[in-house]
Amino acid sequence: EKTVTENADGTYDRKLTVKGKVNSESSKAPLDVIYVLDRSGSMAYPMDHDSQNSWENNGERRTAASQAINSMTNTLAANENLDVRFALVTFSGNKSDYRPGGYRDEAWNDAEIAVNWTNQASVITNRTSPKSDGGTNYQAGIRSAEGLLNGKRQNAKTAVIFVSDGDPTFRYRSDGY
């Protein structure tokens, strides 16, 4: 409704009345992000060398990978238009090692879910600098990420970010182990 009233001094007052409902619903877009991070031995190598024992060290590959993941995580978490959740899978492998508990390192345990779904960026950024050791079992990392997809939100867009420095060196046998 709009009204105009003339005042005694020759000026006018204009009144505008607006009616509507108050909406308190959030319109944040849901996003689920899974990072799949290589923690094989070569991730400890300098960025431009194929050996950990090079003369020149311009930063480790794992440091660059961690910084990239942490930067992306913090940027996404700070976006007020997103309702974002994160998960982190790490993978490597070394067929000759025995792990705690007496388990032999086999393809089936070459990956771990380091962080299950969380909306806390700091949980991810505190876990992206794992030790680097063993071979590169892409398959184990991808299978673990696939398992996390079962826990994703149905209404969320999903991104799987795969971070590695090289070709796979281990894989599952034909029987799945």
PLM-predicted stretches and their roles:
Residues E1-A8:
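Low-complexity, acidic Ser/Thr/Pro/Gly-rich terminal tails and inter-domain linkers that flank the onset
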Residues G10-V22:
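Short beta-strand elements of extracellular/lumenal beta-sandwich folds
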Residues S24-I113, K157-S164:
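Von Willebrand factor
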Residues M43, L82, S92-S144, N150, ...:
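Short, charged loop segments at secondary-structure junctions
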